[in-house]
Structures are given as C-alpha cells and as structure tokens.
UniProtKB/Swiss-Prot annotation:
Highest taxon in the source lineage: Bacteria
Annotated family: Belongs to the bacterial ribosomal protein bL9 family.
GO terms (BP aspect): translation
HAMAP family named among the record's database cross-references: Ribosomal_bL9
Pfam families named in the record: Ribosomal_L9_C, Ribosomal_L9_N
The protein's name in its UniProt record: Large ribosomal subunit protein bL9
Function per UniProt: Binds to the 23S rRNA.
Keywords: Ribonucleoprotein, Ribosomal protein, RNA-binding, rRNA-binding
NCBIfam families, A to Z: L9
InterPro entries per the UniProt record, alphabetical: Ribosomal_bL9, Ribosomal_bL9/RNase_H1_N, Ribosomal_bL9_bac/chp, Ribosomal_bL9_C, Ribosomal_bL9_C_sf, Ribosomal_bL9_N, Ribosomal_bL9_N_sf
Taxonomic lineage from the root: Bacteria, Bacillati, Cyanobacteriota, Cyanophyceae, Synechococcales
Any Gene Ontology CC annotation: ribonucleoprotein complex
GO molecular function: rRNA binding; structural constituent of ribosome
Keyword Ion transport recorded: no
Length: 152
C-alpha cells in the first residue's frame, strides 16, 4: 500500500475537494502537481490553525445569515397581508395575471425589504381574492404570506 500525504487545498480542485479542505493524496500527485500549481499547501500546524479559523468564521457567517432570514420572516409574517391592485373585468377575473415581480414589488413597497422575485412561489392567479404565497429567504427559512388581489 502506497503512503499518502495530507495537504490543504488552496483552491477548489475537481473531484478532489474545495478550498480549505484537508485531503489525503499520493505523494507524487502532491509534489508534482498540487504544490507547484499552487492548488495546495503541505499540512503544518500554522496551516491547520488557519483552516480552523476559516471554518469557524464561515460557520459564524452562516448562522448570522440564517438569523437575519428568520428576522425577515417574522417581519413579513407580522405584516401578513399585502395588497396588489389589478384591473378587473366581469366575474372577478383580472386582466393578465399576478406575477412574482408584482408580489416582490408589493413586499418592497410595504416593508422596504428587497425580495428576489425568483424566490417567490405562488399559484396561478387570474381572479380577485386572497392567496397564500411562499417567500424563500434562506435555504432553511421560508415565509408564508397572504396577498390580496384587489380591483383598481
């Protein structure tokens, strides 16, 4: 069995790992490719400390992002209902449809929070009334708000 050496990746390497990962590779691969190309560093105490510091900082950033998303969720759900005005015809049907952009604009007007329209999930809306809409604020945080489609 060949001896393997540990290196810390300085960049993402295809089929090997991401920046900051501690990986075991063949000594020739490390010596002839990874180290000369600047894709990895040999493992030392100082490098391991840097890796741990980076991981801790990244974990703290992810926790802060999730907390901010939860705060935005409570703010959106506190307001609860957003009104979108559309031109309507007979039988409560509206001209056109309500889009993700309309919902994002209504949320921005009411809360001054910018919401990406691609993160909004809503049903097909062709009539006046009340509808439930999901707004994805984070990978783990989704807010559910109600929109009211009203006539102009």
């Amino acid at each position: 069995m060949a001896k393997r050496v540990q290196v810390v990746l300085s960049q993402d390497v295809y089929k090997l790992g991401r920046d900051g990962d501690l990986v075991e590779v063949a000594p020739g691969y490390a010596r002839n490719f990874l180290l000369p190309q600047g894709l990895a560093q040999p493992v030392t105490r100082g490098v391991l400390k840097q890796v741990e510091f980076r991981r801790a900082r990244e974990a703290a950033r992810l926790v802060a992002e999730k907390e901010a998303a939860v705060a935005r969720k409570t703010a959106l759900e506190t307001i609860g209902r957003f009104v979108i005005k559309k031109q309507a015809g007979e039988g409560e049907s509206i001209f056109g449809t309500v889009t993700n952009g309309d919902v994002a604009e209504a949320i921005q007007v009411a809360t001054t929070q910018e919401v990406d329209r691609r993160e909004i999930t809503l049903p097909e809306i062709h009539k006046l009334g009340f509808y439930k809409v999901q707004v994805k604020l984070h990978a783990d945080v989704t807010a559910e708000v109600e929109i009211q489609v009203a006539a102009l």
